[in-house]
């Protein structure tokens, strides 16, 4: 029987409202400032250029549908770091931008960790507040209920990096608001990922090992 794997481009809106499962063989979120800033700068350069109708393509996200506790989830075989960064970016950006462009107040998807279930709701705690002495916009670290967990430190640090990047040059908020949530067929600039959904009858961990051996 033929294996009907799916490979296509998906824009950011097509990633939303899905449930992503991060299995035990994946390491935690570990993007440093440099990696987060590289993504932000690359997107802003694309948004600023004369590229109407073109798209910025992120690296692949590889998933496989699995059943967990009688629910359908998408097990993330490759692309966890990108998927997590996009979610953190949306949590920060939507608080800065949504009222200005008539977009829904929040864009989101669910990420569940096999080995760290207690921090599943951490992304919903990312909140912008004002520093009393300077009135500067900052990430409210008092909302972090998991300060001793290494994953939470990286997630909150990424949120702070993203917020500071937007506040350093606020026109970036406008540019992201114009293009970040565009669909594939919008006719304007959009952000897309290479989406690969495998239906192979194999352990996803084996697929993960095979893919990483080729990198």
For every predicted segment, state its role:
Residues 1-215:
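Glycine- and hydrophobic-rich flexible loops that cap the catalytic core of alpha/beta enzyme folds
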